[in-house]
Swiss-Prot record:
Binds the 23S rRNA. Its cofactor is Zn(2+). This is Large ribosomal subunit protein bL31. Binds 1 zinc ion per subunit. GO terms for cellular component: ribonucleoprotein complex; ribosome. PANTHER family: 50S RIBOSOMAL PROTEIN L31, CHLOROPLASTIC, LARGE RIBOSOMAL SUBUNIT PROTEIN BL31C.
């Protein structure tokens, strides 16, 4: 491989909007993100269920398609 053509690979501090921070390696020193595994609903178990049946009923009522 050629020398001096690759960017520097250094320790990167990743900071989330929720306040959580962790370190990884990257070519930048700091990285700010909006959501991480500490605050994402999938990882925290705070998922909300979508009520698809209610949406269908609302559509039918709106366009008078109910029987």
């Amino acid at each position: 491989m050629k020398k001096d053509i690759h960017p520097d690979y250094k320790v990167c501090t990743v900071t989330c909007a929720c306040g959580n921070s962790f370190e990884t390696k990257s070519n930048v020193e700091t990285l700010k993100i909006d959501i991480c595994s500490s605050c994402h609903p999938f990882f925290t178990g705070e998922q909300k269920l979508v009520d698809a049946a209610g949406r269908v009923e609302k559509f039918k009522a709106k366009y008078n398609m109910a029987k």
